[in-house]
Regions:
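Basic, amphipathic "hinge/linker" alpha-helix immediately C-terminal to the N-terminal HTH DNA-binding motif
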Residues: 21, 72-93
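N-terminal helix-turn-helix DNA-binding core of bacterial DNA-binding proteins
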Residues: 9-52, 74, 79
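Alpha-helical residues within the helix-turn-helix
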Residues: 44, 61-62
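Amphipathic alpha-helical dimerization/coiled-coil segments
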Residues: 88-118
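Residues within the DNA-recognition helix of helix-turn-helix
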Residues: 56
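Long, low-complexity, charged/polar intrinsically disordered regions in eukaryotic proteins
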Residues: 1-9
Length: 118
């Protein structure tokens, strides 16, 4: 199981990469920003296996980005914390950069955040 161990690197990018550098972490946060809250929603949206999702959700809780509510329920919701919501501008910048540089000429990048999430 993945656990969160804060980086001791003096570089702020290295510290952020320690937490956010995992592909699943970014996609879980993306879907949480778009309204996913329950374990099954993340499984369905991401196609992630249950063990990987369980470990990433635990890691995001340890890091203070998600809160499980209620803590001991099998039907718990995973709620974004203020610390996680502070990442919205980072995701907006990442989406803008990707749209400008990773899509072929003439290829339309989806809007971020989607209009349905507004």
């Amino acid at each position: 199981m993945k656990t969160y161990t804060p980086s001791r690197a003096p570089c702020p990018i290295a510290r952020a990469a320690r937490l956010l550098g995992d592909r699943w972490v970014l996609l879980i946060l993306r879907d949480a920003f778009l309204g996913a809250e329950r374990f099954e929603e993340f499984v369905e949206r991401l196609g992630i296996n249950r063990a990987a999702l369980t470990s990433r959700l635990a890691m995001l809780q340890e890091a203070g980005l998600l809160r499980r509510d209620p803590p001991d329920s099998k039907r718990a919701r995973y709620i974004l914390t203020d610390k996680a919501r502070a990442l919205v501008p980072v995701f907006e910048q990442m989406a803008g950069w990707s749209s400008a540089h990773l899509f072929a000429e003439g290829e339309q990048a989806p809007q971020w955040p989607p209009a349905s999430a507004a």
